Amino acid sequence: MQADFVIIGSGSAGSALAYRLSEDGKNSVLVIEAGGSDFGPFIQMPAALAWPMSMKRYNWGYLSEPEPNLNNRRITAPRGKVIGGSSSINGMVYVRGHAEDFNRWEELGAGGWAYADVLPYFKRMEHSHGGEEGWRGTDGPLHVQRGGFTNPLFRAFVEAGKQAGFETTEDYNGSKQEGFGLMEQTIFSGRRWSAANAYLKPALKRKNVEIIYGFAQRIVIEDGRATGVEIERGGKIEVVKANREVIVSASSFNSPKLLMLSGIGPGEHLKEMGIEVKADRPGVGANLQDHMEFYFQQVSTKPVSLYSWLPWFWQGVAGAQWLLSKGGLGASNQFEACAFLRSAPGLKQPDIQYHFLPVAISYDGKAAAKSHGFQVHVGYNLSKSRGSVTLRSPDPKADPVLRFNYMSHAEDWEKFRHCVRLTRELFGQAAFDDYRGAEIQPGESVQSDEEIDAFLREHLESAYHPCGTCKMGAKDDPMAVVDPQTRVIGVEALRVADSSIFPHVTYGNLNGPSIMTGEKAADHILGKQPLARSNQEPWVNPRAAVSDR
């Protein structure tokens, strides 16, 4: 088996790469995917989003090592093991990231990845329904929509933000990237619009694209050049030959793992594992970043939440309606209102993210209380805490060692305490007077810094946005793994293109910027001139220097 380009992983970036690298018909593309098909309602029905993440069939099911600042809990760290990768098991929330995020990338050594550079790629990939004219793409493969916004609790949340003095935005992915507004979703015609649906399946209709379902064990490197990929398929070991390049798009956990198994990574660690060092790159597996969040939950005094739909019978009714018409409650992820806020004056960009949900549920999808309720997922998005991905053993089937070092900076605790108190302020606004019941979580008795910290240690969870473990940077940066053209430094014909190359985590969810990374990397791989830089300047809050709102 051979192809011009061999892509490891069919996730958000990998699917986009397969689509763009094969677009002109001149190059053969082979995609290696360890998972399987995405067929069936568990993935395709938006309201069923909790199911695929809980199924070993679709999820690698990783856990962190015990986190010392979180009562030594092992934090769940899901990654998609299916075509579409994590875009097939995520919450379908679409966030590009803030302009300052990408300007920061360039400052950190990723030349050519500033906001002006990446905005044209976001436009190229989008098919926006209702986004801000001039700022959004309208004919790309990735459909992006807003929900129906019919539940009164959604409107109450946005109105509460206004009453508290915060900005509102008609399109947080457009010019005004701060405030309360409608959440955007990767949903189209009532179905999850994953990277597989948007990019991979159309690409596979071309004669020059093929997918192999197998487990990539290592990259074959000969005389400093990547020449293929060793895979395990059906109990047999095979080698897929790359005539031009190998591109790794296997996730922020598995991309560094695969590089290390192939001899690319921190030299001492590789020697400890008995792996021959092909390129000593200490940055491989370092710089692990993520977002954390907690659920703030409140009883609703009116029966307007989704609580009535939680019993199995009514879930079945919603599922049947979706199967018949692709409509009803099953056609939404129920994340239809959100906010991006600054925690303090003087900040250039929002650092707090809110997802609002018109029901109070636990992480396992069960009701948090035997009553109607509502909640927000809230978190600080710009933590300075950094972790690592290392090998557990030289066995390719062994899970990687994930150490996030969550909450290792004093600022993290300060910001999350602020999240608790700010949410109480928001839920205390007049907009919620008709709905506000008792506080379920954290609970009204949790007031002091010490009480809030104890709550956070037990209830903070990952928002499932890992990145940064194969950092993109300047060639003379000893911790950079890839250069700004996504080429692995020290090995020819090898690239990495997924969220692992982010120099710094972006605000919000990472599916959007991961797809953009695949889009832009494809142009670098093909030697194309990058899309023309944008001269559009996003809105800047005129009160930013003196106010948080």
UniProtKB/Swiss-Prot annotation:
It catalyses: choline + A = betaine aldehyde + AH2; betaine aldehyde + NAD(+) + H2O = glycine betaine + NADH + 2 H(+). FAD binds at residues 4-33. One of its GO terms (molecular function) is flavin adenine dinucleotide binding. Residues 529-549 are annotated as: Disordered. It is an enzyme of class 1 (oxidoreductase). Keywords: FAD, Flavoprotein, NAD, Oxidoreductase. Transmembrane segments: none annotated. PROSITE patterns: GMC_OXRED_1, GMC_OXRED_2. The active site is at H465. Pathway: Amine and polyamine biosynthesis; betaine biosynthesis via choline pathway; betaine aldehyde from choline (cytochrome c reductase route): step 1/1. Disulfide bonds: none annotated. Its EC number is 1.1.99.1, 1.2.1.8. InterPro entries: BetA, FAD/NAD-bd_sf, GMC_OxRdtase, GMC_OxRdtase_N, GMC_OxRtase_C. Gene3D superfamilies: FAD/NAD(P)-binding domain (3.50.50.60), Glucose Oxidase, domain 3 (3.30.560.10). GO terms for biological process: glycine betaine biosynthetic process from choline. Its cofactor is FAD. Belongs to the GMC oxidoreductase family. Involved in the biosynthesis of the osmoprotectant glycine betaine. Catalyzes the oxidation of choline to betaine aldehyde and betaine aldehyde to glycine betaine at the same rate. This is Oxygen-dependent choline dehydrogenase. It comes from Rhizobium leguminosarum bv. trifolii (strain WSM2304). The gene is betA.
